[in-house]
Amino acid sequence: MEGKCLCSAITIRTLDKKSIDACHCGMCRRWGGGPALVVSCGSEVQIEGIDKLKVYKSSEWAQRAFCSECGTHIFYRLLSTNEYFVPVGLFQDDLEFEFKEQIFIDRKPSYYEFANQTLNMTEAEIFTKFASSENI
């Protein structure tokens, strides 16, 4: 799969991943003005246009990146696993995705709602999952 930022300065390539997750945490909502709708791309990601990529450490466990030219969000990356989460909007419109999971569901504001039936995880469930995966 291939995705691009608005100005095409950055191209991201990954293996075909066809599921979308939503994150309702406060950081993601602040970052994008609403929930983050992302494709979990694993660690096998190729990025062209690195010179235009602006990366910052947004928490003790993750980095966020955007295009320094147009501001498009490029990825959220977990530091412990090197797993990339890429906004679904970067990929071609003709790709078929399945909406699978919503995390931080207990942090979702009441002013929006998705109709899809998904797996839902609370903040506590997510932090428990991350804590157990770091102890492997």
Put a short name on every predicted segment.
Residues 1-4, 9-136:
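A short Gly-Trp-Pro
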